[in-house]
């Protein structure tokens, strides 16, 4: 990979506890240290922003169950909060690493019974990912890594997450996203990610 005037977006996706945060950090470190590239790393949803705080309140403190349409509109607004920052980095040649992005909106929205065309419209003005990598692991593996956050708002947690995983794999095949076995060590996963990134760019 060589530094260009216009940067790239690499998105890491997958169910909760699949290792996205760790791998995003490792990838960012590798690109800076070994390839001497500028990187920017974003974790979504960002619960520290104004909209993010609304999402957190809506998920955790609302008296009624979360309405899927309202929730996905809020998630979209959360992404739009950082759109200008993403574009700034891209225009400056950065590699932008996304820990979740609009792909999660499509997958979770689909599992929540929402229309995928409507979901796509929500993000049509967001910068597009140049590479999307799915970190795939069965729920039986990820549930041993800790308690998922806000994954069970629409039904039993395990059943819901299994549907999300199936949707990620189905959409990955359709959209030509890369899929990595995330049941292995973080070092093995990192090596696979680097191989994919180097081959892609």
Report the location of each language-model feature.
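ATP-binding Walker
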Residues: 18
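A glycine- and Lys/Arg-enriched "phosphate-lid" helix/loop adjacent to the NTP-binding pocket
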Residues: 100, 105-166
């Amino acid at each position: 990979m060589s530094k260009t005037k216009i940067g790239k977006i690499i998105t890491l996706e997958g169910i909760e506890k699949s290792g996205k945060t760790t791998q995003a950090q490792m990838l960012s470190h590798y690109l800076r240290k070994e390839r001497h590239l500028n990187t920017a790393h974003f974790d979504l949803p960002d619960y520290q922003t104004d909209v993010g705080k609304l999402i957190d309140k809506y998920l955790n403190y609302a008296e009624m169950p979360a309405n899927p349409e309202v929730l996905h509109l809020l998630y979209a607004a959360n992404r739009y909060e950082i759109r200008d920052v993403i574009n700034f980095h891209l225009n400056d040649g950065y590699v932008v690493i996304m820990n979740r992005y609009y792909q999660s909106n499509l997958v979770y929205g689909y599992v929540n019974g929402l229309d995928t065309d409507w979901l796509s419209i929500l993000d049509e003005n967001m910068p597009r990912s140049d590479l999307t990598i799915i970190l795939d692991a069965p729920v039986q593996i990820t549930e041993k890594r800790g308690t998922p956050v806000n994954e069970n708002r629409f039904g039993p947690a395990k059943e819901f997450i299994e549907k999300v995983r199936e949707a990620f794999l189905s959409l990955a095949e359709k959209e030509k996203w890369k899929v990595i076995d995330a049941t292995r060590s973080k070092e093995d996963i990192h090596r696979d990610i680097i191989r994919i990134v180097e081959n892609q760019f």
